[in-house]
Amino acid sequence: MSINTGAGTRIYIAPRLTADLPADHAAAITLLSGLTYVEIGEVESIGDYGDTINDVTFAGLAQGRAKHLKGLADAGTSELVVAFDAGDAGQIKLVEAFLDRSRFDYPFKVEYVDGEVDYFAAKVMSNKKSGITVEGVLKRNVTLGINSEIYEVVTP
């Protein structure tokens, strides 16, 4: 595997899940990789994403020292910035996902230029327009609230 820039990276959205992802890692990847995705067009940037483990501390009286334990894993939120295109099928799906109040998540696939893929399940938490200036490109800023681990599929 070599290093790359982000150029050529693509992100896709699939229809809403109808159940929770399987707890088994391999089964979740099998399910996610078998879905039909729509590419989100005109993507300028994909914000940071990935798990952070919460710090749980315990202050033992006898030891006089804090102990750190691992708590909840949180993949956080990721901000997508796209050039606004009301006719783009992927952006239409993002808006539909934003308006959807279901408890189930939407699968996303991030495909890198070297063929590696990340999958995750998220809710679309915001849908804002920006770049409204004389020489600005009208953009859509979308926040994804990630509710699963990041399933990395590495090419051999």
Question: What positions do the PLM features span?
Answer:
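Short beta-strand and beta-hairpin "edge-sheet" elements
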Residues: 111-150
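Short, acidic/charged, Gly/Pro-enriched secondary-structure junctions
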Residues: 90-121, 125
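Residues within well-ordered beta-strands of beta-sheet-rich folds
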Residues: 79-81, 107-109, 143-145
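A generic structural signal for short beta-strands and their flanking turns/coil linkers
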Residues: 74-78, 102-106, 140
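Viral virion structural and adsorption modules
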Residues: 1-5, 143-145, 149-156
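Short acidic, gly/pro-rich beta-turn/loop elements at beta-sheet edges
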Residues: 21, 90-92, 118, 132-134, ...
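Charged, amphipathic alpha-helical segments
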Residues: 77-97
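Solvent-exposed edge beta-strands and adjacent loop segments
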Residues: 2-81, 125-137
